[in-house]
From Swiss-Prot:
Organismal lineage: Eukaryota, Fungi, Fungi incertae sedis, Microsporidia, Unikaryonidae
Family statement drawn from the similarity comment of this UniProt entry: Belongs to the UPF0329 family.
Protein name: UPF0329 protein ECU10_1860
The organism of origin for this protein: Encephalitozoon cuniculi (strain GB-M1)
Amino acid sequence: MDVCLVDGLWGRRILVGGRKGAVHGCGRQRALEDVKVIGMYSRAGWDIMCLSDGGGGEKLEDGLGWRFSRSKIEMLKGSLEEGGGFRDSDLAPVGCRRKGICFPVGGLLPYLALRSVAYICVFGDSSRAPDLIREAFESPHFKRFDGAGTYKEAKGRCGMRFADVVNGAFGQISDMADKVGKGEPEVWCIWKKRGEVEMLLKVKEYRKGYGSGKRRRR
């Protein structure tokens, strides 16, 4: 990932660059060398942005023109180490707010965290954005990702609850159900059996009732 557009960090829209990139925020634009945003993660109401460089926090602060709260950073580190199973050496948390994802170096991006990623783009060439997104989210490695399997292997160390895995799977099915009947070829290719399509329509109907606060009795 070359760059990551983080929308809402400390209430500001900030574009953080990788190698030879720049930070845009507070009316400033300064170079960042050899610093890559690994990701962000929301845990216990905190937002953590992690960089590939252990000293990236200071560089980011210089580019933005303000200092992050050291007490909040230490609190975040403690929360991640104790509750999330992350090691201090894995992370370089530099900011916190409300939404985002965190990514341990060399680990798998938590399943639910994927839905928190806002945008990915490249400085100076916005036409490369779709290619970068495709590279990140349509790679064979990502397609083979199994949320339930990761949950079992982590044994709670990543802070993922089983309910999160179930809700995530239900959300995926519901999203697929929304496409049923709209004539999208890829959907009908995947769900070509009549029984499977009927089941999707039932899920779609159930979700409508669930979203309005009314659950159907069976």
